[in-house]
């Protein structure tokens, strides 16, 4: 009896139950993993999507800001008062306006300036203004060059040697009133004048014949000086009363 009882106990083997994870097929595992990855992607993409929607400003507000920037494209830095005015027009906060201008100066402003340079109408106007300015400057410089000659211009003229009569201060006779003198001058032989090439700073050489006319004048001067010296000597020799 004991042997018979032991026999069935030995023949019965315990049945092992597999866990649910082990009983699932590989296809089910793949679908679960892909589903988990998709859920994770949705969670990660959700904040970015919200952020993009938050950064988009209304089209009317952007147009107002772009118009202001185009008018002030050479100095696109609005002051606090101007920011307040734009905030009232666009219904945006001051922070949004400041951020928009920071980004617009890097992305939009260069295109605005380049578009203005490439515009043929604006370039034609600029060329006309430059041509008009050049004409005005040319007209202003013409009177200065062709103005009346002043004393400075007269002094800058070259000095030519004057005739002998004009150098001594004599009055030249009228050729019409004295025809006989004119004939006499024509009949007289021309004097030879020696011309020497010298530097402008050195005085012109004068022939000794020109000094002959002043000999009598020099004698009178010497006589007057001598007479004055004699009178002075006589005054010194006279005794005091």
Curated annotation (Swiss-Prot):
Gene encoding the protein: TGIF2LX
Family: Belongs to the TALE/TGIF homeobox family.
GO cellular component entries: nucleus
Chain residues forming the annotated DNA-binding region: 48-111
Cell compartments where the protein resides: Nucleus
Pfam families, sorted: Homeobox_KN (PF05920)
Record-level GO BP terms: negative regulation of transcription by RNA polymerase II
Gene Ontology terms for molecular function: DNA binding; DNA-binding transcription repressor activity, RNA polymerase II-specific
Task performed by this protein: May have a transcription role in testis.
Protein name: Homeobox protein TGIF2LX
Keywords: DNA-binding, Homeobox, Nucleus, Transcription, Transcription regulation
DNA-binding keyword on record: yes
Biased composition, class Polar residues, residue ranges: 21-39
Region of interest (Disordered), ranges: 1-58, 126-209
Listed PANTHER family: HOMEOBOX PROTEIN TRANSCRIPTION FACTORS
């Amino acid at each position: 009896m004991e042997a018979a009882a032991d026999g069935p106990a030995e023949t019965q083997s315990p049945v092992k139950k597999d866990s649910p994870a082990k009983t699932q097929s590989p296809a089910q595992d793949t679908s679960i993993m892909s589903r988990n990855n998709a859920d994770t992607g949705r969670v990660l993409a959700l904040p970015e999507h919200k952020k993009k929607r938050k950064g988009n400003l209304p089209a009317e507000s952007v147009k107002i800001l772009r118009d202001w920037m185009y008018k002030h494209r050479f100095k696109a830095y609005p002051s606090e008062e101007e920011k307040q005015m734009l905030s009232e027009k666009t219904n945006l906060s001051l922070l949004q306006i400041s951020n928009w201008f920071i980004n617009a100066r890097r992305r939009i402003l260069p295109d605005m300036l380049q578009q203005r340079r490439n515009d043929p109408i604006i370039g034609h106007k600029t060329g006309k203004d430059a041509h008009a300015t050049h004409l005005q400057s040319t007209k202003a410089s013409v009177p200065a060059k062709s103005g009346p000659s002043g004393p400075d211009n007269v002094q800058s003229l070259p000095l030519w040697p004057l005739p002998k009569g004009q150098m001594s201060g004599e009055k030249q006779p009228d050729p019409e009133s004295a025809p006989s003198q004119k004939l006499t001058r024509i009949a007289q032989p021309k004097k030879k004048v020696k011309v020497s090439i010298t530097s402008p700073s050195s005085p012109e050489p004068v022939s000794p014949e020109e000094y002959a006319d002043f000999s009598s004048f020099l004698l009178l001067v010497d006589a007057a000086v001598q007479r004055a010296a004699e009178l002075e000597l006589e005054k010194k020799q006279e005794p005091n009363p």
